[in-house]
């Protein structure tokens, strides 16, 4: 979500009309754009109104630099299915035409494709390009590989393709080289490698993106370059996921 919000902020600084939709029950995708946790998610309003009318303006919160922020929300703790909630929420967004006149919509989706609900932006054609954020840690790469499997499964139904891997550094040994080989092995590219810097944490404490908190910083420029790389990216592919044993061997090789 930190990467997603900074990319949204970078696109908005490029003059794009941007919307970001958080597809995670935690409701925290747009926190850095709004300066607070979203107080009214789509599913919150659905529960409150019990089938009554909801206005588009009620589910859209305008954040940094005019970015339209929407949180799908989730079920009450211990009740219902979060994945199903995302299906309901995105359908409501579509019905209400809540995105307005936007140039770019960013869907921030939970990392693991744990059920069909979380794959809705891929499966139902909401998204055209998928970017996977991953570190060089084994379980992060495992999740990335699972998402690649999901993209491959649903790519035949529409135009969705994988645009690349966004490296999100955890300071693992030889991390950038590992991520680059992983990306190339599954048939895509390492479109950016984001270093782990304390300024990102400092900005989060102030409930801001790096683009807002420190717009002249080197880290802000990293996110701007990523946004430009996404804007001009023409390498969109259907991935060829790895088998786990091969992935594990690759990680071990770079760790030695």
Task: Give the positions of each predicted feature.
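Hydrophobic positions on the alpha1 helix immediately C-terminal to the Walker A/P-loop
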Residues: 3, 7
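N-terminal phosphate/diphosphate-binding loop that engages ATP/GTP or pyrophosphate donors
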Residues: 10-72
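Conserved catalytic-core segment of NTP-binding enzymes
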Residues: 13, 88, 95-104, 109-196, ...
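Short, hinge-like loop/turn segments at secondary-structure boundaries
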Residues: 35-40, 148-151, 181-184, 208-212
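Flexible beta-alpha connector loops of hexameric P-loop NTPases
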Residues: 74-84, 138-139
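C-terminal boundary of histidine-terminating zinc-finger modules
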Residues: 206-221
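Extended, charge-rich low-complexity interaction segments
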Residues: 218-236
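A short, charged, Gly/Pro-tolerant segment at domain boundaries
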Residues: 229, 238-256
